[in-house]
Amino acid sequence: MAKKLKTAIILQAREESVRFPNKVLSRVAGKPLILRLLGRLKDSKLKNQLIIAIPKNNKNDKLNNLLKKNKFNVYRGDEKNVLKRYYNAAKKIKAQIIVRITADCPFSDPKLIDKFITILKEKKLDYVSNTLYPTYPDGLDIEVFTF
């Protein structure tokens, strides 16, 4: 029997957007945008864990408090180095496959995420994405890779 690899969705989020400050906390149909997105991500059937990677600074405390209040797993890391934040979040939870989602892609589709995870596993690939050659509308960006 094949070993089951730990698959984690890591959502990159922050409050201090330049074009639309506090976008992730903006309300859509009465609920913060980030909670709507997380509700969709939770529906992925092939993920073992969902973690939100946010900068460790006081500018993101409101976001952190909202996520903790709603019982989400949060990793707070390097403010400037997003790659380091991702790496440390993945290392903390011992992920073997990472699904990279950004909070500015609020329409992430859990079925599409599961499809990409399946492709990565079945074809024994290291990387699957719909961003190298845009094949889906903006807001549906997904990257899946081994770690």
Language-model-derived ranges and their functions:
Residues 33-50, 63-65, 69-70:
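A short, N-terminal amphipathic alpha-helix
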Residues 47, 94-95, 122-126:
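Short, high-confidence coil segments that cap the C-terminus of an alpha-helix
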Residues 140-147:
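Short glycine- and hydrophobic/aromatic-rich loop-to-beta-strand nucleating segment
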Residues 1-21:
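N-terminal nucleotide-binding beta1-loop-alpha1 segment
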Residues 86, 105, 109-135:
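Conserved donor-nucleotide/metal-binding helix-loop-beta segment in metal-dependent transferases, i.e.
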Residues 68-80, 91:
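Conserved donor nucleotide-binding strand/loop of the catalytic core
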Residues 98-99:
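Short aromatic/hydrophobic "clamp" motif used to bind/position activated sugar donors
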Residues 55-60:
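A conserved acidic beta->alpha catalytic loop
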